[in-house]
């Protein structure tokens, strides 16, 4: 077992009002799972990914990685969990604006073999000619593909992807999801949020969220 989420709750305030983004969510993610998370906007899907990824501290409950609560450890442990075990593709991409595409990708490379694979990923994602461009010089789709390569380049234990093909044409969507499936076949674990049928067709498990809860 790779990850266990036990009864996590997360609330936010909007002005004077409080709303619940996650309401007692529990979930087991086994090594080698390919989990697709569905649900309407505001259902809690992205908040769940952020909690799994070590980015937001739940108000209650626990997120266990190999038996250790990632939020009940020293911050350095949480940082190592995020850097060494998680590949995260955000909807907002979060590319460093002062770094080129290839420099952004290298931020996620911890071994020489990861760096050696960069050009193959750039070619398969049609970004070879953009490798020395800065984020402001890229289209939204090109930024998305660069963010994807950064997330997957180190073959992390767990790939978290939030709408990974949302800004891509069918050809680039297919190329990206082919790389995700190859990663999964080699033993990687995937948690993916998407409304795109192509993105979820390889999923081995599916859940649906509504109002911060898993309903199906």
Report the location of each language-model feature.
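Conserved ABC transporter NBD signature motif
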Residues: 61-72
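Helix-to-loop junction immediately C-terminal to a conserved catalytic motif
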Residues: 53
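Catalytic Walker B motif of ABC-type/P-loop ATPase nucleotide-binding domains
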Residues: 159-162
């Amino acid at each position: 077992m790779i990850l266990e989420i036990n009864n996590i709750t997360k609330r936010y305030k909007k002005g004077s009002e409080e709303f619940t983004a996650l309401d007692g969510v529990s979930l087991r993610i086994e090594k080698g799972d390919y989990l697709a998370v569905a649900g309407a906007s505001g259902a809690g899907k992205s908040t769940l990914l952020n909690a799994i990824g070590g980015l937001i501290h739940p108000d209650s409950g626990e997120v266990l990685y190999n038996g250790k609560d990632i939020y009940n450890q020293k911050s350095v442990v949480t940082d190592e969990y995020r850097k060494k075990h998680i590949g995260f593709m955000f909807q907002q991409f979060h590319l460093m604006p002062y770094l080129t595409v290839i420099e952004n990708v290298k931020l996620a490379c911890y071994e020489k073999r990861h760096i050696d694979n960069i050009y193959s990923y750039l070619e398969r994602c049609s970004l070879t000619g953009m490798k020395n461009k800065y984020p402001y010089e890229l289209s939204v789709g090109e930024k998305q593909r660069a963010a994807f390569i950064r997330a997957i380049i180190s073959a992390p234990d767990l790939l978290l992807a939030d709408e990974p093909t949302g800004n891509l044409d069918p050809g680039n969507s297919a190329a990206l999801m082919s790389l995700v499936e190859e990663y999964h076949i080699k033993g990687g674990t995937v948690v993916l949020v998407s409304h795109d049928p192509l993105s979820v067709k390889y999923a081995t498990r599916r859940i649906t969220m509504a109002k911060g809860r898993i309903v199906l």
